Amino acid sequence: MKPTEYLKSVGIDIFLEGHNSYKLASTGYMDLTVETWQGGDDITFVSMCHYGEQNGDLMADSDILFKVEQEIITYREIQMAYTAYYSEDHAEIKDFMENTWVDNLIQQGHKVYEKDIEA
């Protein structure tokens, strides 16, 4: 599942105007913090991370920032099949997000417990 689909499934609208933050929890697991903000030109930035405490300081453990562009970036038809292109530099991160981290969050059952919406 794509991170944007997961966020929508737990009630987070990444396209809300402003800089918004959400905290999600699941008993026995680290809380998840999600922040969203707009960068202009139909671009939305999303940060997803877990925070842990180390020597009294908050440390991000798995902190991923990605941007969502609300337009078609690349489209190519090959024998009637859709092919998406991702930078080689980001392919490993994309695979981790879609096939590991999001699946783990779903299985762990994180739910939104706090919202800070900039109106």
State what each model feature region is.
Residues 13, 31, 41-42, 57, ...:
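Acidic-enriched, low-complexity/disordered segments with a strong bias for Aspartate over Glutamate
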Residues 18-20, 28-32, 42-44, 62-64, ...:
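Generic structural motif recognizing short loop/turn segments at the entrances and edges of beta-strands
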Residues 74-119:
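Helix-rich interaction surfaces within compact, conserved domain-sized segments
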Residues 51-89:
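Amphipathic protein-protein interaction modules
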Residues 1-53:
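Negatively charged, low-complexity tracts enriched in Asp/Glu with abundant Ser/Thr
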